[in-house]
Amino acid sequence: MNIRPEIKTAFIVIILGIAIWILLTFPFRYGLDIRGGIRVTLQCQKTEGVEITDDAVRRTIEVIRNRIDQLGVTEPSIYKEGSDKIVVELPGIKDPERALEIIGQTALLEFKDETGKTILTGSALKNAKVEFDQVGQPMVRVEMNPEGAKIFADFTSKNVGKQVFIVLDGKVISNPVIKEPITEGTGVITGRFTIDEAQKLAILLRAGALPVPVKVIENRTIDPTLGKDTMESAYRAGVIGAILVVLFMILVFRFLGLVADIALLIYVVLDLAALKLLNATLTLPGVAGIILSIGMAVDANCLIFARMKEEYAQRKTPMASLDAGFRNALRAIIDSNVTTILAALILFYFGTGPIRGFAVTLSLGVALSMFTQITITRTLLENLLSLPVFKKATKLLGL
């Protein structure tokens, strides 16, 4: 089925317009190595009665994610590494010590009677927030779910005049005396907290206790200026590389090379727009994947043009050389790109963090480069060869 060149050109213009709109509308997500922040590796600890299972690690990740969300950190990255490790990456964070305390604390809250028997745990809480008493001292008001409220009302009704011990991770943080039955399902936790301590406790209680204890085995702080300097160096190198590629393509392939440069620019716009649309996090390995896919796109154009020259040497017309050149080069291009995508999929499956970012940008870039070569590059070349000036001026064309 032959599609008219005008329709193909209109399709390219529409796709390019949408891509430019995406680039101008949506922001990039930058990874830790570019934006700076902290990277913490946690190891789940096996204790008596607690097994380290995939489900336990998954639930631990969810609790940590809830805590981080309440810290107000944008675009955190939390993922499992191995069978018992959790990696937490927090870009752009301003108070890493406080974040580390909130991330790694088990936060098992217990309400105990004077004999040490546990009456309630933090799982009975529905909400926790910071309030202030009459003298401005911060405290944490907790609200219980219906089941917890019923149990606590029954306990306080039977133990008026006795103490209730509020214990966090085995440490008593408050031991008030029960003056009257508490039937509303709310209570306050006092303990000479600072405002930061009260806010931290409220966050921990709202997010819930970690299903398994964790231990910090690695903690790295990444300076944002390092990522900025690296990106500036990569940008300069990219500009210089792009200029050299453009000059090389024009010098070797002349007008064919110029068309390839235009198609390459369109490809870069489509690739960056696709990354933004997928909400992908851009890291330095991801940038490397983009650059590598651009290199593969240039290689494919060189292969197509070399085939076109071979066909033209057999006294074919420029348009017939174009058809035969694409047809003969397509198999090699597809084989090369599919092999690269398979390698990227293996990296994505077995890798973590930055390795996955490299795999995503590489596979996406390679897939888009195939689309660009088959549709955009060919359409641009067909439009070029249809011009009367190039029907005889084949030297200028590059054939």
Curated annotation (Swiss-Prot):
Molecular-function annotations in GO: protein-transporting ATPase activity
Compartment(s) of residence: Cell inner membrane
InterPro entries per UniProt: SecD, SecD/SecF_arch_bac, SecD/SecF_CS, SecD_1st, SecD_SecF_C, SecD_SecF_C_bact, SecDF_P1_head
Pfam families xref list: Sec_GG, SecD_1st, SecD_SecF_C, SecDF_P1_head
Alphabetical keyword list: Cell inner membrane, Cell membrane, Membrane, Protein transport, Translocation, Transmembrane, Transmembrane helix, Transport
Statement: the UniProt record of this protein carries the keyword Membrane: yes
Domain of life: Bacteria
Membrane topology qualifier: Multi-pass membrane protein
Principal localisation: membrane
GO cellular component: plasma membrane
Ranges that cross the membrane: 7-27, 239-259, 262-282, 286-306, 329-351, 357-381
GO process terms (BP): intracellular protein transmembrane transport; protein targeting; protein transport; protein transport by the Sec complex
Keyword flag Protein transport: yes
Family stated for the protein in its record: Belongs to the SecD/SecF family. SecD subfamily.
Protein's job: Part of the Sec protein translocase complex. Interacts with the SecYEG preprotein conducting channel. SecDF uses the proton motive force (PMF) to complete protein translocation after the ATP-dependent function of SecA.
SUBUNIT field: Forms a complex with SecF. Part of the essential Sec protein translocation apparatus which comprises SecA, SecYEG and auxiliary proteins SecDF. Other proteins may also be involved.
Protein name: Protein translocase subunit SecD
Natural source organism: Dictyoglomus turgidum (strain DSM 6724 / Z-1310)
Lineage: Bacteria, Pseudomonadati, Dictyoglomota, Dictyoglomia, Dictyoglomales
